[in-house]
Amino acid sequence: MVYPVRNKDDLDQQLILAEDKLVVIDFYADWCGPCKIIAPKLDELAHEYSDRVVVLKVNVDENEDITVEYNVNSMPTFVFIKGGNVLELFVGCNSDKLAKLMEKHAGVYTDEAADVKAVHIDGECIVDLTAESSESDNDNNNVNEVSAHDENAVLEH
């Protein structure tokens, strides 16, 4: 089951109730396309690991204080917490990586899960909350996007 967090006090209470279980916080927005893409997989994983994992959803538009506290700049962002400690962060909508991280931190450890790094950003599948809408700002902060599959790509400035 995925639990929608209402506010900071609610989040704090859910973290206490989780005790020694893994907590996965999904930072999302209703208007975020990548968030909608990964939501069904998150629901599936929450059901599959319900005995070991608590999945919480935090709407960034309704809970700015929590979003700032966890330094969330893009969506979807998944924060993995156990025993009150942040273990790992994953940004993007790659459902395979999300599943591997759940396996890794929920105690279902595989060699494949061991290859997962501490911070993951799937740049093809995020919404950047820090992006400026002004064209002049975008010109000053020229960001070049390259497909993760294009090994021969060259960035031009």
From Swiss-Prot:
Domain of life where this protein originates: Eukaryota
Pfam families referenced in this protein's UniProt entry, alphabetically: Thioredoxin
GO BP annotations listed: protein folding
Disulphide bond pairs: C32-C35
Gene Ontology MF terms in the entry: protein-disulfide reductase activity
Coarse class of the protein's main subcellular location: nucleus
The Thioredoxin domain, residue ranges: 2-107
SUPFAM superfamilies per record: Thioredoxin-like (SSF52833)
Cellular component terms per the entry's GO annotation: cytosol; nucleus; Y chromosome
Family: Belongs to the thioredoxin family.
Cited function: Probably participates in various redox reactions through the reversible oxidation of its active center dithiol to a disulfide and catalyzes dithiol-disulfide exchange reactions. Its tissue specificity suggests a regulatory role in the germline.
Name used for this protein in its record: Thioredoxin-T
